[in-house]
């Protein structure tokens, strides 16, 4: 994961939300914009739960990102957790990520 920077400011997140393509799953939403460098952000709102649940949701999403890092095209990503994420098995979440990854690769940029 060398060379990956995190999105830090509201402006950076808003840029990805407005200009990016949203890929929805029952457990998370992935916003993506092709770019020349790899930047990543993780979001879990209070709808997901209290701080402990939100942090766990972000850890699960980070684990997904690390697992698929080599297969992801370079760009800016924002993973947004949904409340169902915490009740789901990691295997099921992994399957959803595989589907989204295929959709990203099929799309013509």
UniProtKB/Swiss-Prot annotation:
Key words of the record: Endonuclease, Hydrolase, Nuclease, RNA-binding, tRNA processing
- One Gene Ontology cellular component annotation held by this UniProt entry: ribonuclease P complex
Q: What is its EC number?
A: 3.1.26.5
What InterPro entries does the annotation carry?
Answer: Ribosomal_Su5_D2-typ_SF, Ribsml_uS5_D2-typ_fold_subgr, RNase_P, RNase_P_CS
Q: What broad class of enzyme is this?
A: hydrolase
Gene3D superfamilies xrefs: 3.30.230.10
UniProt key word Ubl conjugation: no
Pfam families this protein is in? Ribonuclease_P (PF00825)
- The organism's place on the tree of life at top rank: Bacteria
Catalytic reaction(s) noted: Endonucleolytic cleavage of RNA, removing 5'-extranucleotides from tRNA precursor
Question: What's a BP term from Gene Ontology annotated to this protein?
Answer: tRNA 5'-leader removal
In alphabetical order, the GO MF annotations are: 3'-tRNA processing endoribonuclease activity; ribonuclease P activity; tRNA binding
Q: How does it assemble?
A: Consists of a catalytic RNA component (M1 or rnpB) and a protein subunit.
Q: Note the HAMAP family from the entry.
A: RNase_P (MF_00227)
Q: State the PANTHER family in the record.
A: RIBONUCLEASE P PROTEIN COMPONENT
Record function comment:
RNaseP catalyzes the removal of the 5'-leader sequence from pre-tRNA to produce the mature 5'-terminus. It can also cleave other RNA substrates such as 4.5S RNA. The protein component plays an auxiliary but essential role in vivo by binding to the 5'-leader sequence and broadening the substrate specificity of the ribozyme.
Provide the family line. Answer: Belongs to the RnpA family.
Q: What is this protein called?
A: Ribonuclease P protein component
Taxonomy, top ranks, is: Bacteria, Pseudomonadati, Campylobacterota, Epsilonproteobacteria, Nautiliales
């Amino acid at each position: 994961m060398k060379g990956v920077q995190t999105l830090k400011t509201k402006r950076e997140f808003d840029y990805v939300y407005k200009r990016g393509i949203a890929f929805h799953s029952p457990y998370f939403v992935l916003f993506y914009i092709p770019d020349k460098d790899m930047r990543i952000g993780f979001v879990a709102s209070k709808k997901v739960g209290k701080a402990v649940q939100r942090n766990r949701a972000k850890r699960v999403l980070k684990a997904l990102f690390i697992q698929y890092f080599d297969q992801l095209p370079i760009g800016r990503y924002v993973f947004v957790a949904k409340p169902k994420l915490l009740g789901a098995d990691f295997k099921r979440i992994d399957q959803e990520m595989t589907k989204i990854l295929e959709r990203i690769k099929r799309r013509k940029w």
